[in-house]
């Protein structure tokens, strides 16, 4: 059994967790949503300062919940890429300090690999190879998971990430930040077939369209044009929200199912904040069942950023002897296919 303490500060959640293999011993998340809502999105400098103010509290709370001794901790992990540089620095510095003081190996973790491993916490039988759909405010990717540290990107977004599109459309509808949960709630009272909207396709130079890549900028523009047709007091917010959400869900579902079938992958695992979206869950579950595929969604609390998923990824890296040098820095960008650069 491997016990890891992990820290996640890549964006606007300060999170600390302690995990024993698939068992979450403690998980503390301090969200900054109320702070950034005033500005309609994450302000990087403010996020970094808030991490500095809350990291010690989160560490103390997570530690007290376990009753462990430091001798029982095998390694210390932190998200080091990708993300906001200042925010990442807070978590990485705290983790390195603990690693030095308590003489533990340090394990730098890729944020997207953490989202993949969120499904491992919920499904102990999940084993590679499988297809991972990662959908969040910063990423929309189809990943062929071959092994711990071995990933092949099969599809991505060419412009806005899915979660980013939700936030932008929410602003068009005069809804608050973050847009994803609010649009999901509003859509429950709307008609998803009220307004036909374009899915967004990527043309190939040789003709036809890219099978797995997504585009959401055209969809966002279509919603803008639709909104402009109505007087502000008569805007059918619920119907527009439902139509937009259904279009995104259908687009992601079609690409994901086609990718899984083309690559002969029988299992699909979903990760990232948009994995909490009810329409996406319904569309994917129905389509997977129709094609005799298995689809896993992590619990809602593991869809958004948390440190338990980072710790679970670190468990496998620890068991494989993948440790990071203490001289390693943070990176705002790092392809998941290059994750092994983080280790000695």
From Swiss-Prot:
Biological processes annotated in GO: tRNA threonylcarbamoyladenosine modification
Annotated GO MF terms: iron ion binding; N(6)-L-threonylcarbamoyladenine synthase activity
Gene3D superfamilies per the UniProt record, alphabetical: 3.30.420.40
A family per Pfam: TsaD
Cofactor note as given: Binds 1 Fe(2+) ion per subunit.
EC number: 2.3.1.234
Residues bound to Fe cation: 111, 115, 305
Catalytic activity from the UniProt record: L-threonylcarbamoyladenylate + adenosine(37) in tRNA = N(6)-L-threonylcarbamoyladenosine(37) in tRNA + AMP + H(+)
Cell location: Cytoplasm
PROSITE patterns: GLYCOPROTEASE
Binding site residues for substrate: 134-138, 167, 180, 184, 277
Keywords linked to the UniProt accession: Acyltransferase, Cytoplasm, Iron, Metal-binding, Transferase, tRNA processing
Class of this enzyme: transferase
Cofactor(s), names only, from the UniProt record: Fe(2+)
Any one GO CC term of the record: cytoplasm
Primary residence: cytoplasm
Function: Required for the formation of a threonylcarbamoyl group on adenosine at position 37 (t(6)A37) in tRNAs that read codons beginning with adenine. Is involved in the transfer of the threonylcarbamoyl moiety of threonylcarbamoyl-AMP (TC-AMP) to the N6 group of A37, together with TsaE and TsaB. TsaD likely plays a direct catalytic role in this reaction.
Annotated family: Belongs to the KAE1 / TsaD family.
NCBIfam families per UniProt: gcp_kae1, T6A_TsaD_YgjD
HAMAP family according to UniProt: TsaD
Protein name per its UniProtKB record: tRNA N6-adenosine threonylcarbamoyltransferase
Species: Microcystis aeruginosa (strain NIES-843 / IAM M-2473)
